[in-house]
Amino acid sequence: MVSSQPKYDLIREVGRGSYGVVYEAVIRKTSARVAVKKIRCHAPENVELALREFWALSSIKSQHPNVIHLEECILQKDGMVQKMSHGSNSSLYLQLVETSLKGEIAFDPRSAYYLWFVMDFCDGGDMNEYLLSRKPNRKTNTSFMLQLSSALAFLHKNQIIHRDLKPDNILISQSRMDTSDLEPTLKVADFGLSKVCSASGQNPEEPVSVNKCFLSTACGTDFYMAPEVWEGHYTAKADIFALGIIIWAMLERITFIDTETKKELLGSYVKQGTEIVPVGEALLENPKMELLIPVKKKSMNGRMKQLIKEMLAANPQDRPDAFELELRLVQIAFKDSSWET
C-alpha cells in the first residue's frame, strides 16, 4: 500500500554513519519510541549496503534479545511511502535490486529515494562509549561476554555472517534496567556488510553451514579483521576472531586512537616498534606469532586466556565455532567465580 503519510515522527538525530542517519522517532498512533535509520539511495554503494542489511534482518524469523530487531522497512520515493518486503514484485524494490546488482542507478536520478529501517531504540549509546566512560567492572564484563556469544550463535544459526563486529556496532539498551543491579542489554547492529549464506545447490532444503560458506570480499574494520579476511578467503570463523579481539580488549581495557576520527576505541593490537598493527594483519605476516595474553594485567584465568588464544588462532579451523564458544564462556563464567583474576 502506497501512502503519503508516514507513520513515524522523527524527533532528533542520534547517530550518523557513512551511508545513513539514525533518528529517535515515535510511532504516531502509539507514541512508542523507535529508531529510524534513514538511508538515501543516491549511489549504488548505498543501495547495496542497505539491501544487505535489509536481507539479513528480514531473513530472521524469530527475535533475539541481543540482536537488533527490524520492525519494518519503508521505501520512500518523492514523498510517497510504501512498506518493503523481501522478494517483493514492487517496481520500486526491483529497481533497487537492479541498482545493487549492476552497480549503477536503475531509476530516475531526479527522484529522491530513501529507505527507512524502523528498529529497536537503544538509549545507551554503543559498547565503546559505555565501557570507556566507566571503571572496569567484572560483572559487566561477564554479562557482555555472555550476551555477545549468545547473539553470535543466534546469527550463525540463522546463516548470517556479520563481517563487521566491533564495539561501535554493538548498541546499549538501558530502558529495561529496573534496578542498579542489572546490567544493560547489548544489541548487535549495523548489518550493512553482512552476508546471508544461501542453501547449497545439492540440497536446497538443507541450510548451508556458515563455517563452510566461503566468502572472498575483504571487508570490515581492520583492527577486528581476521588474517584470512585480509587474504580474501574466509567463513563465519572471521566473526569469532573479531569477537576475540573485542573480549580481549574489554577484559584488559586495551584501546587505540582512530587516526581518522581521533576517537579512543576498544581493540587489541600488536606493537611493532612504535607502530600498532591489527592482530589479523600481524598473524597473516607471521602465523606462528605467539600473542602476549594478558598484555597489561599481571595474570589472567588460564581457561579464559586459552579461549581467547583459540578465538584468535591464525588458522580459522583452530577456532571454536559460535556454539562451542557460547558453551565455554558459560562454563567459565558460572563454574569459576574468579575467572577474571
From Swiss-Prot:
Keywords noted in UniProt: ATP-binding, Kinase, Nucleotide-binding, Nucleus, Serine/threonine-protein kinase, Transferase
Residue stretches making up the Protein kinase domain: 8-334
InterPro entries named among the record's database cross-references: CC_SR_Kinase, Kinase-like_dom_sf, Prot_kinase_dom, Protein_kinase_ATP_BS, Ser/Thr_kinase_AS
Active site: 164
PROSITE patterns associated with the record: PROTEIN_KINASE_ATP, PROTEIN_KINASE_DOM, PROTEIN_KINASE_ST
GO cellular component: nucleoplasm
The keyword Nucleotide-binding belongs to this UniProt entry's keyword annotation: yes
GO molecular function terms attached to this record: ATP binding; protein serine kinase activity; protein serine/threonine kinase activity
EC category: transferase
Domain of life: Eukaryota
Location in or out of the cell: Nucleus
Short name of any one Pfam family annotated for the protein: Pkinase
Sequence positions that bind ATP: 14-22, 37
Main subcellular location: nucleus
Keyword Iron: no
Reaction catalysed by this enzyme: L-seryl-[protein] + ATP = O-phospho-L-seryl-[protein] + ADP + H(+); L-threonyl-[protein] + ATP = O-phospho-L-threonyl-[protein] + ADP + H(+)
EC number: 2.7.11.1
Recorded family membership: Belongs to the protein kinase superfamily. Ser/Thr protein kinase family.
Name of the molecule in the record: Serine/threonine-protein kinase PDIK1L
Source organism of the structure: Mus musculus (Mouse)
Lineage: Eukaryota, Metazoa, Chordata, Craniata, Vertebrata
Name of the gene this protein is made from: Pdik1l
